[in-house]
UniProtKB/Swiss-Prot annotation:
Disulfide bonds: none annotated. GO terms for molecular function: rRNA binding; structural constituent of ribosome; tRNA binding. HAMAP family: Ribosomal_uL1_B. The gene is rplA. PROSITE patterns: RIBOSOMAL_L1. It comes from Anaeromyxobacter sp. (strain K). The lineage of its organism: Bacteria, Pseudomonadati, Myxococcota, Myxococcia, Myxococcales. Part of the 50S ribosomal subunit. This is Large ribosomal subunit protein uL1. SUPFAM superfamilies: Ribosomal protein L1.
């Protein structure tokens, strides 16, 4: 543990907690502060000037990261007939209907994402207590309830990430791995921020993006220059 603490301290000393970093420098620091032997995930913590207690200020969405998430996504799809065939041809790992629901009720959870056609939501809805707590319930707002399965499957396989503002007005979203080149991390992060700026509720008052911090799984937080972000996404 002392060795771990020493490595974290050395990483943290590279970061000036009082400074807001330009994106290029922030992405470079993210890589420098990744100290674990495994390939750490890089996350953004985005503090928004919204009150999620009001339904019209719930910020949520999804974005296909230009450089993916650096991992293979196992995808399950609820569909029948021609739509089941469409999902299989697009690259879905598991495709089913009532049979898949029975497997999930029996404890099968060998997938990372779940998509369904609208007509299958009656079946999927019965799995709410299993899927909901795991964040796997399909939702039309993020494109996981759809008739366009070919597109949905390809997007998920390419590295589509979903986000939703939490109670404190914070969005947590992963955007790559510490092994990524800084330019790829920057492109993925910029794609997320583009969607978040566009998702600003009309009823939100004052400053919308109040703080942005980047970090690896076990690394220190790195604050981002908000003026640069605002200029890029004006």
């Amino acid at each position: 543990m002392a060795h771990v603490a020493k490595k974290y301290k050395a990483a943290a000393e590279k970061v000036d907690r009082t400074k807001r970093y330009k994106l290029d420098e922030a992405m470079s620091l993210v890589k420098q502060t990744a100290t674990k032997k495994f390939d750490e995930t890089v996350d953004a913590s985005i503090n928004l000037g919204v009150d999620p207690k009001h339904a019209d200020q719930v910020v949520r969405g999804a974005v296909v990261l230009p450089h993916g998430m650096g991992k293979t996504v196992r995808l399950a799809v609820f569909a029948k007939g021609d739509k089941a065939k469409e999902a299989q041809e697009a690259g879905a790992d598991i495709v089913g209907a009532e049979d898949l629901a029975e497997k999930i009720q029996g404890g099968f959870m060998d997938f990372d994402k779940l998509i369904a056609t609208p007509d299958m939501m009656g079946v999927v809805g019965r799995l709410g207590k299993i899927l909901g707590p795991r964040g796997l319930m399909p939702n039309p707002k993020v494109g996981t309830v759809t008739m366009d399965l070919a597109r949905a499957v390809k997007e998920q396989k390419a590295g589509k990430v979903e986000f939703r503002v939490e109670k404190a007005g914070i969005v947590h979203v992963p955007f790559g791995k510490a092994s990524f080149d800084p330019d790829k991390l920057k492109a993925n992060f910029s794609a997320i921020m583009e969607v978040i700026y566009k998702a600003k509720p009309q009823t939100a008052k004052g400053v919308y993006v109040k703080n942005v911090t980047l970090s690896t799984t076990m690394g220190p937080g790195i604050k981002v220059d908000l003026a640069e972000l605002a200029a890029q996404h004006a």
